[in-house]
Amino acid sequence: MNRYFSLRDEVLHLLDEKSHGYYKREAIAHMFQVETLCVLLAKERGLDEELCAIIGLLHDVAVPIYSSSFQHATRSSELAKELLGPIFSDEEKKYYFHCN
């Protein structure tokens, strides 16, 4: 789970810089609720829990960062590619980058 904690900290730092007030609080709540559901599904289906937690964490990451839901799936995917960088294998990255 080291990769998860590193990415979580980076995402929270981005939110501190780019998002504010109620919108930021709602985004953080949504992010962690979806992450929790992803981990529960991973446990139930025997999937990689760390990878699923990260998918939940990043699934809508662009919405609070850009303060817009316009093309949020594509924008979140692009932002996730930047955040994930070289720490994930190509096999792992393909699960997140489904919308491209």
Region locations from a protein language model:
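Metal-dependent phosphohydrolase cores
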Residues: 1-100
